[in-house]
């Protein structure tokens, strides 16, 4: 029994099915994202969205969608769906959906009269390529499938308007065609495992709307280019694979490529397996190293999010090697910043004052999940560098005072995760002594002392850490614990912010807390 399955009643009800979105990534920054009925509801949605290094590595939508049509006895049955001006949905392909499940890969089952057709989508790991396998499960008469590619070739946060600047040519390649609408973009190769018939039928499809953008009050209408369509006859029991990528592929390799990729997938047969799959979607591996993307479809690599999410996205799902490889990339950028002040080109926010503290916290989780011995062997040098860097007041915006408490300046630029800005100023200007910064600092000192406890060469370092711990324990309580039994959010001079925020939960939830 599939853990994630939606039946016909839900799928044909757009009020229920459109809000349900799915995401597939290749762990190299490319993704496929849409609603479970295949109707794009955001401008960031697309069948193939890839980062382009020559364009600041921002994600660009190359292939927005692929509309399928089942043809029997000359009668077309359109399986696609788009929203057009005025809230009109056309074609209404969702009415043919009988089931959607996502146990190993997203699979949609359509029924058109006597025809039962399944569609399964899979992203190739580490490659900018998506495969879609169509299987004709049942048919009582000759059947042909027609495919119309909707091309965008735009940055994922922009919209495309009909224009005359595009390159309309489609180059014939093995079992398909290749297209590149604008200079500077990679060529999109659209190929099949079976030889299709290509019909050149270029049109702009105008006035496509994205309802989520409409609700957000941002631009939501665009025009998409459809250069023509493919036609492929299919027999009962037969499967056809469609490939979209930025490199040409041998059509004969598509079946083997699909089977190899699906064999490596974790079935979503439980809530844990769903979380495991979701965690791995955010891995980003390229020539610069291994990273964690902060979110799709508009996330980037952020230092704080990397260290905060690293244990949960790796150690919690038994991916120790991924923790170590991502930590190696992130810690190298952190050490470079601590040594030279040079910002990272890939990991944004490496200069924020709490980043070293979250790095130590992530290593602490490694010690708990793997072993203290392993953590000491791999990360003791890094922990020592971080502690000394902070104690020597080398960070430009994190200062240690006489009570071993740390303060920061956040009046003009946000320094914590509460980083919303309005009119060039932080919405909440948290400045001075921040409760979670000091709790993280206390925790880091205690952990560093524990990690170096049996290290004869680091006894002086161990004693120094414990001295700082003893120095700040009572001042922390005196500064943050108020008469109402909870913690102030931050203290700046004579002002103590009484706002109840989750930052105090960090302070009480750490392994070592000055409140113990």
Predicted regions, residues:
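Conserved oxyanion/phosphate-binding beta-strand-loop segments in alpha/beta enzyme cores
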Residues: 259-296, 409
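Alpha-helical support elements that line or immediately flank enzyme active sites
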Residues: 297-330, 503-515
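Flexible, solvent-exposed coil segments and beta strand-coil junctions
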Residues: 111-115, 339-342, 486-488
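The feature captures the catalytic groove of carbohydrate-active enzymes
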Residues: 129, 200-229, 233, 238, ...
């Amino acid at each position: 029994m599939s853990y994630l399955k939606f039946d016909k009643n839900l799928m044909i009800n757009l009020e229920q099915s459109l809000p349900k979105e799915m995401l597939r990534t290749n762990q190299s920054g490319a993704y496929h994202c849409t609603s479970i009925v295949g109707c794009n509801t955001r401008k960031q949605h697309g069948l193939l969205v890839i980062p382009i290094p020559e364009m600041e590595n921002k994600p660009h939508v190359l292939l927005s969608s692929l509309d399928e049509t089942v043809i029997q006895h000359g009668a077309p049955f359109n399986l696609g769906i788009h929203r057009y001006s005025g809230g009109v949905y056309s074609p209404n392909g969702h009415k043919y959906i009988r089931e959607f499940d996502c146990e190993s890969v997203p699979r949609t089952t359509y029924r058109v009269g006597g025809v039962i057709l399944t569609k399964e989508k899979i992203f190739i790991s580490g490659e900018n390529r998506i495969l879609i396998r169509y299987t004709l499960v049942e048919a009582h008469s000759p059947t042909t499938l027609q495919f119309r590619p909707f091309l965008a070739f735009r940055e994922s946060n922009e919209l495309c308007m009909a224009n005359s600047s595009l390159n309309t040519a489609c180059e014939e390649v093995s079992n398909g065609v290749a297209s590149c609408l604008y200079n500077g973009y990679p060529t999109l190769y659209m190929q099949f495992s079976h030889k299709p018939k290509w019909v050149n039928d270029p049109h702009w499809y105008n006035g496509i709307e994205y309802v989520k953008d409409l609700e957000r009050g941002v631009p939501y209408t665009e025009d998409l280019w459809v250069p023509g369509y493919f036609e492929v006859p299919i027999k009962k029991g037969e499967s056809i694979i469609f490939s979209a990528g930025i490199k040409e592929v041998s059509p004969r390799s598509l079946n083997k490529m699909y089977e190899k990729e699906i064999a490596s997938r974790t079935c979503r047969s439980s809530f844990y397996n769903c979380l495991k799959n979701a965690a791995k979607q955010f891995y980003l591996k390229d020539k610069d190293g291994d990273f964690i993307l902060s979110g799709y479809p508009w996330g980037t690599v952020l230092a704080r999010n990397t260290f905060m999410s690293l244990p949960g996205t790796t150690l919690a799902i038994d991916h120790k090697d991924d923790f170590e490889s991502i930590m190696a990339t992130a810690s190298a950028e952190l050490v470079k910043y601590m040594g030279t002040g040079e910002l990272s080109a890939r990991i944004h926010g490496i200069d924020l004052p709490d980043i070293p503290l979250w790095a130590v916290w992530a290593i602490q989780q490694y010690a708990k999940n793997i072993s203290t011995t392993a953590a000491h062997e791999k990360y003791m040098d890094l922990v020592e560098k971080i502690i000394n860097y902070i104690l020597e007041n080398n960070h430009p915006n994190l200062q240690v005072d006489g009570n071993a408490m740390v303060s920061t300046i956040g009046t003009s630029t946000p320094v914590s995760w509460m980083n919303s800005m309005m009119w060039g100023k932080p919405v909440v200007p948290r400045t001075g002594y921040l409760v979670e910064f000091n709790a993280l600092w206390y925790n880091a000192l205690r952990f560093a002392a524990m990690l170096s406890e049996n290290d004869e060469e680091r006894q002086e370092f161990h004693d120094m850490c414990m001295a700082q711990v003893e120095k700040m324990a009572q001042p922390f309580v005196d500064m943050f614990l108020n008469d109402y039994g909870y913690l102030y959010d931050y203290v700046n001079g004579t002002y103590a912010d009484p706002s109840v925020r989750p930052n105090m939960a960090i302070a009480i939830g750490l392994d070592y807390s000055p409140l113990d």
